[in-house]
Amino acid sequence: MENLRRNIAIVCGGDSSEHDVSLRSAQGLYSFFDKEKYNVYIVDVKGTDWHVNFSDGATAAIDKNDFSFKHNGKTVFFDYAYITIHGQPGENGVMQGYFDLIHLPYSPSGV
C-alpha cells in the first residue's frame, strides 16, 4: 500500500545568533506531531546550506529549485512547511516569499 502520509518540513536555523534556539524550537514542534499520520523532517537553513537532519545524524541537501531532497534513492517533496526560524530569513519575509514562489503552503503568515 502506498504511503499517504503528508510530508511536513519544520524549517529552522537561520542566519541570526538565535540559530540554536530555533533548532530547539523545531525539536519541540517535532515532538508534537503524530508520526503515524505525518512524515516530519527538520530542515536546517544557514546561509546557502539547507539540509534535512535525520535522527541518526545523517543529513540530506535540500534542492532549492523545488524544496525537495533525496532519501533512499527517492525524491521527497514537501506538502507543508512550518517556519520556526528566529530572525532572518524567517522573520523578514524571505522564506515566505520563497515558499510563495514554489507554491508550498506554510505557516506562519505570508509575506
Residues of each region from the PLM?
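ATP-binding N-terminal substructure of ATP-dependent carboxylate-amine bond-forming enzymes
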Residues: 1-111
